[in-house]
Amino acid sequence: MKLISLLERLEYTCLQGSTEQEVKNVIYDSRKVEEGSLFICIRGAVVDGHKFVPDVIAKGAKVLVVEEAVEAPEDVTVILVKDSRYAMAFISAAYFGYPAEKLKTIGITGTKGKTTTTYMVKSILENAGYKVGLIGTIEAIIGDKVIPAKNTTPESYVIQEYFHEMVEAGCDCVVMEVSSQGLMLHRTQGFIFDFGIFTNIEPDHIGPNEHKDFDDYLRCKSLLLKQCKVGIVNRDDEHFDRIIEGHTCSLETYGFSPEADLRAEDAKLVGGKGYLGISYHLKGLLDFHVEIDIPGKFSIYNSLTAIAICRHFKVSEENILKALKVAKVKGRIEMVKVSDDFTLMIDYAHNAMALESLLSTLREYHPHRLVCLFGCGGNRSKIRRYEMGEVSGKLADLTIITSDNPRNEEPQAIIDDITVGMAKTDGKYVEIIDRKEAIAYAIHHGEPGDIIVLAGKGHEDYQEIKGKKYPMDERVLIADILAGK
């Protein structure tokens, strides 16, 4: 296709060459350039794509999209843009024929609840007869195709490629998780979401490799409400007024607040042997009783979010309730049967907010003991380690501190940081570096009435050590332990 058609919704300056140039494909990885490619020079945190200009020209690139002037032969067209990541989103959308305009698009952001809510929405809409694509932390789902995820929110080119494949597969709509990094790096530019959902916000993802401070984190998250037609926001969030500041969408709210458009009232814990759940009554825009077999107040918020979205798709009460019963997410309060005496679950809680919410919720079910096993990721904020240690020390009867993804740090050094937070409490703890050994300890020392939580890994099926990912699925580890391996 001609370059001019790829640039039709973008501000740019043509430094040399012709915008009538034919483009074979759009590339942002210099290793994939071929004859006739358009190459986008991305200025990354580690590598600057501009330095690969001589290489991609040698491979046959005919168009360069740049943020600064570069030297290139006369037969190479050079397009100057203010931000090449932003430009890539619009170029990619044009390249794939603006597929988002053929779908109902639902974007969900927030510190927690994104993953569970996306699967709830998918379950409800599919139960009502819609064909739904999904993009998220765990995977992308396009028809019968499942693609393991590398990032919560992929690069803009990949998003548009997925959208295109969803249209080809006959999807009506797509629900996707939208990370603060994805918003900050313009991965979701090039289209406007039909629905943008903001679940909550608490300090997280703050550090040298992520956001400089909470204000930056909040600012990036709230960009979604400037990139959607209808915004659906948690009215109970303490930062609500800042979240909606400058929004350009029509706004709806949900929560327990009397001011919320969709409200939960009369919440109750429900449970039995191997079953932990919650029920509530829905009021406001809809009026019916809801029961979910996922414990905790956050399950109410997740289901409220999903219901608030699906209301716009005219889904019946019957379909909503039926779908919520079967909506399950790998690694999100995932019950694993190991004994009739105690309950064991796997959960992705990997920051203090999520861990506190999870443990506080489970405390409400009055276990004999609440046992929390977790570690923290290497090459990430130390503050997270202190905070998680303190949270577990306060809320768990026993904490088993172990390894998560140590990456390039020594596992014991990470554990030592966690114990700094533990020391602020009277909580009992043991240190077991090897995660399989730690899980075995938890199972073999389980007592009747215990609730045991394996926190942090969730859906992940690997452990990252010194730059390499080794296979490690907690479900497999548990099966091996029970088999005596």
Where do the model's predicted regions map?
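Acidic, Mg2+-coordinating active-site environments of NTP-dependent enzymes
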Residues: L7-R9, V70-D75, A169, M184, ...
